[in-house]
Amino acid sequence: MSGQFNNSPRGEDKDVEAGTSSFTEYEDSPFDIASTKNAPVERLRRWRQAALVLNASRRFRYTLDLKREEDKKQMLRKMRAHAQAIRAAHLFKAAASRVTGIASPLPTPGGGDFGIGQEQIVSISRDQNIGALQELGGVRGLSDLLKTNLEKGIHGDDDDILKRKSAFGSNTYPQKKGRSFWRFVWEASQDLTLIILIVAAVASLALGIKTEGIEKGWYDGISIAFAVLLVIVVTATSDYRQSLQFQNLNEEKRNIRLEVTRDGRRVEISIYDIVVGDVIPLNIGDQVPADGVLVAGHSLAVDESSMTGESKIVQKNSTKHPFLMSGCKVADGNGTMLVTGVGVNTEWGLLMASVSEDNGGETPLQVRLNGVATFIGIVGLTVAGVVLFVLVVRYFTGHTKNEQGGPQFIGGKTKFEHVLDDLVEIFTVAVTIVVVAVPEGLPLAVTLTLAYSMRKMMADKALVRRLSACETMGSATTICSDKTGTLTLNEMTVVECYAGLQKMDSPDSSSKLPSAFTSILVEGIAHNTTGSVFRSESGEIQVSGSPTERAILNWAIKLGMDFDALKSESSAVQFFPFNSEKKRGGVAVKSPDSSVHIHWKGAAEIVLGSCTHYMDESESFVDMSEDKMGGLKDAIDDMAARSLRCVAIAFRTFEADKIPTDEEQLSRWELPEDDLILLAIVGIKDPCRPGVKNSVLLCQQAGVKVRMVTGDNIQTAKAIALECGILASDSDASEPNLIEGKVFRSYSEEERDRICEEISVMGRSSPNDKLLLVQSLKRRGHVVAVTGDGTNDAPALHEADIGLAMGIQGTEVAKEKSDIIILDDNFESVVKVVRWGRSVYANIQKFIQFQLTVNVAALVINVVAAISAGEVPLTAVQLLWVNLIMDTLGALALATEPPTDHLMDRAPVGRREPLITNIMWRNLFIQAMYQVTVLLILNFRGISILHLKSKPNAERVKNTVIFNAFVICQVFNEFNARKPDEINIFRGVLRNHLFVGIISITIVLQVVIVEFLGTFASTTKLDWEMWLVCIGIGSISWPLAVIGKLIPVPETPVSQYFRINRWRRNSSG
């Protein structure tokens, strides 16, 4: 099955840039879906201007507010300008002070529990006043005033945290209040059709009281007004609930978890729990969580564009440029910061307090469905106009009959008040047809299903950042997945080791290693790491850092490494953080005897390639011959073939006097990486996640090809791919199925596009290789999902149709560029996201089929009846009730259907596949025609068929039966809509409690309206026989649906025939 789905789209059908049809200009139909990820605002604005929109305020209530987006951007620009103005003023003032010799005065200390007050520290930090900081004794002097130990952090007990929050505030900012319920009521009441109905209700009330008296004259007017009020309240309630859900999800997105140093150990806390005085480690890709100063760092560079608006990377150091602004991203290097300002006392906090956070997304499905609503609204408006014209003409020509069977209007005899009342009633019917015809429930259904899916996906360990990803994931044809932590457990242990050329019997036994060898090895491990080691109060050793770092640090501890002692005895002079491009990281360490060692650690074959010597058991440096190099490469291949990650550790000596002494020159100094001496090669085991093989198989069955893109050795990648089922057998492990990143990037663009679909595993790849693969796959028409965790993965995450960042190992930069965050870093959660994506799309289609059936049936019945008989069987109040069933209750019932395994048996939804499929057209046509036929027969022959001639209110009973049968038909048809392409429409129905509940509520309300609210709804009580007739009419839709599903449909979409004909006409013209 997977084979047929994985074939690339035909070149003649797809545009190479976006995977769109070659008939693109003719395909811009409201029934198609196009990708709008990263769509420019101007394009969205043009779409609105091009559409003829009816009731824009209501139609677009679920789409992006372009004006609000522009206001938000304007506020950002103002805040950035404000920050720059403050700094410019400070620089001017500082320059003047230097010229005149007058020092700028510092604000007075605040006293209290600390040696510095909030006003003073905020002033220094916000103005980036380096002079004032130096007067306090620099960073160390400031830390003393804040009672912070720069190595161990704050005490962090409850009393200490409380005092700091009291003195300096908390790391939160006042949120703008969300819109109140009454605001939603006001917005819902702005619908033009509802306003017209209210006016009509008032007119009907006034005329009715005047002509019929207070006792009976108020019925029609109050009934219409109450029905309109009910629609407004239900709409507002639904909108308000969705707003609260999205507000909660936005809160979850902002709640970043990070590590701080407290009481000598690393602890993970929420960003909201940071306090002034906290010591926070920073690594590449981290977001600076609060304002602060740099304590120490190595090649630390920060992207301040989020605050300054300038795309410039700023180098930071602890003496000249120590200030860090919250909200900025660490672009390179690492370091440690001391927090000086939190919450609204930071510029980021001020900015966030000024700009309200909206859901802000406009999904492709919402765009298209608003187009559908507009398109059908125009049809409804046209039909309503025709009905209004026909009814008015029939009325004034005497063809409209009254209850006694005579003409309702007689020229010169009918009173003006009665004419006005009759015209208001006619106009009300026409307006109500518009209300029913316009499927406003379509955008609501999208919002409901997205909100429901997002909430449920949180339980499945997936946090949706961009709404469009929910839909797009259902169309994914390929997933480019990382290996480490996604396909594997990320629980790494050193299980094999070569010391020099000697394989150790036990990787953690140091008894056979000479002391000098062990000493230089652990020195490099202790300094060349972003992890840390500390002892808890119980004396237990705890290790933090990435899984690879933890594995190597734990191994070094078993070899006898004293982490704290090594860090204090020797100091790191320069640091080169691990780079995913170079696959290695290094550090220059100055020992107590002033000798300098350059330590490197990274991918085994890459570090080994820079080694010219190795250290043997006698502590001698031995030349690395070709034979010895070959033997080590064989050992690496052997470990990789057993799915071990291979890491090499090497060093070299360096002359101390050649190290730059100037801080700026030192920051630009590149560590020498040649003539290295090999110390050790370790094999790290990271087992596959249980169940990942089944997940990969499930994707393949669903037509989604899983590709592994990893930085690991090609042999390691092959072994894991075979274990996970990405490669079926060894026979598949050859190019281009299995390829190295450097080979792929060496190809031309045309060659990459040609082979990209065959690639299953890419080993030793860089983030840029992943980006190139994504671009090639997209050019071939694929909908691409990509997983990533590193800062350098950001371009690929941004370029992909769906970017999936890892919640545990992922950097903040990667998360910010992603569409969905996988909270447990598990590939099984990625597959669940695919299921939910398909569920969103399927649920929308179910609701479209259901609602358009009602639209078509209601329109045809009223139009035919109006033109032929001069009256409509469904009154304004009845149509408003049907509208309520469709728009809100129907959307709730069908848009919240949970995903089923059946969804994963289908091929992915094509990028340009019509929203309304041929199966849906078939089902819709059969049900609508059945309802129209039966109800029109009842309208014209109902009195005789139902034997009502002897009853005094026969006409009212007949119309009540038509209304009741129409509603019950919709109840039965909701079951059909659950399973558009399955015979068994009841499968799983009892597990969907919401569906069962809504069906029950609809039935109960219908009974109440018919039996007890006759005056309100223009109905009369029905006897049990009439109820059986109505139920019988509705129940026939079930066997009819079964018969209909046996009728085959053509593969070519219905809309395609019209497009091809239109294209031919344009071509011939």
From Swiss-Prot:
It catalyses: Ca(2+)(in) + ATP + H2O = Ca(2+)(out) + ADP + phosphate + H(+). The keyword Metal-binding applies. It is an enzyme of class 7 (translocase). The modification N-acetylserine is found at S2. GO terms for cellular component: plasma membrane; plasmodesma. It is a multi-pass membrane protein. Residues 1-29 are annotated as: Disordered. Residues 2-180, 241-369, 445-844, 896-915, 974-991, 1046-1069 are cytoplasmic. It holds the Pfam family Cation_ATPase_N. This is Calcium-transporting ATPase 10, plasma membrane-type. PROSITE patterns: ATPASE_E1_E2. It comes from Arabidopsis thaliana (Mouse-ear cress). InterPro entries: ATPase_P-typ_cation-transptr_C, ATPase_P-typ_cation-transptr_N, ATPase_P-typ_cyto_dom_N, ATPase_P-typ_P_site, ATPase_P-typ_TM_dom_sf, ATPase_P-typ_transduc_dom_A_sf, Ca_ATPase_N_dom, HAD-like_sf. Residues 42-53 are annotated as: Interaction with calmodulin. This magnesium-dependent enzyme catalyzes the hydrolysis of ATP coupled with the translocation of calcium from the cytosol into the endoplasmic reticulum. Keywords: Acetylation, ATP-binding, Calcium, Calcium transport, Calmodulin-binding, Ion transport, Magnesium, Membrane, Metal-binding, Nucleotide-binding, Translocase, Transmembrane, Transmembrane helix, Transport. The active site is at D482 (4-aspartylphosphate intermediate). Activated by calmodulin. Disulfide bonds: none annotated. It comes from the Eukaryota. Gene3D superfamilies: 1.20.5.170, Calcium-transporting ATPase, cytoplasmic domain N, Calcium-transporting ATPase, cytoplasmic transduction domain A, Calcium-transporting ATPase, transmembrane domain, HAD superfamily/HAD-like. Belongs to the cation transport ATPase (P-type) (TC 3.A.3) family. Type IIB subfamily.
